[in-house]
Amino acid sequence: MNILQHFQLEGSVAIVTGSGRGIGRAIALAYAEAGADVVCSARSLADVQAVAEQIRAMGRRALAITCDVLDPEQRQALVRQSHEQMGRVTHLVNNAGGGGPNDPLSMSPGEFEQILNFNVSTAYALCQLCVPLMREAGGGNILNISSVAARYSQRHFSAYGTAKAALSHLTRLLAQDFAPHVRVNAVAPGPTLTEALNGVMPAAMRQAMEANTPLKRLGTPQDIAAAALYLASPASAWVTGKIIDVDGGADATVWPA
């Protein structure tokens, strides 16, 4: 087989959460370009409809489904509709999640738990729903979107960093539980120039962060999507339970002090 054929996803059906914008959108488009049919989900229907239209323009099938991953009924509906309308589910990308800086002396335990639920519990629940369908289809692939915040020691990220560290270790543990027919890996992005980050980052902060990054630039959604495609494709057929850092070579936080 030609080496480039190992990066193809033809015959696959992928659910990508949080795929209306940013990293999720880039992953959905990359999977489609590699031959997958894609279910795009997010809280904003307009956003995922636009992404689905781009995927259909590539000649692939696409669904746009509204889903708040914190809502159990919406999670179940997402997976059920994907299976019913696409015929199978082979790939899951747990991209929906997030969280900002926090003050550990003022954030309530309930607020802390919300960050854990948003980033970890929702991914766990979607894996439970999708893995039986993947096994039914003959095998599958799960990709979790973690963060370098999972391994950096930095101020004001005790909630988000803890949640992403939990997601990274959940990735390793589920890889053992779901082997040999379902692989589970994660990408841990560094600072990535999504619409959300661009909207709040002053030029001086960006310059400082780029100066602190060995490769002297911040990431793009396409950087993350390229790593995601590797982990989703047969090119990584002997890889499971691994976290790939895509961070420009940084070994510590590049955020200005």
Labelled PLM ranges:
Residues N2-Q5, Y152, L229, T240-A257:
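Short C-terminal tail/terminal secondary-structure segment
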Residues V13, G20-G22:
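Conserved glycine-rich cofactor-binding loop
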Residues V93, A179-R183, V239-G241:
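Short, small/polar-rich loop/turn modules that mediate ligand/substrate recognition or access, typified
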Residues D103-L116, L197, M209:
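Substrate-binding pocket helix/loop in short-chain dehydrogenase/reductase
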Residues C127, A163, T171:
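Active-site helix of classical SDR
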Residues P132, A175-P180, A237:
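Alpha-helical segment proximal to the catalytic Tyr-Lys
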Residues S147:
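Residue(s) in the substrate-gating loop at a strand-loop-helix junction
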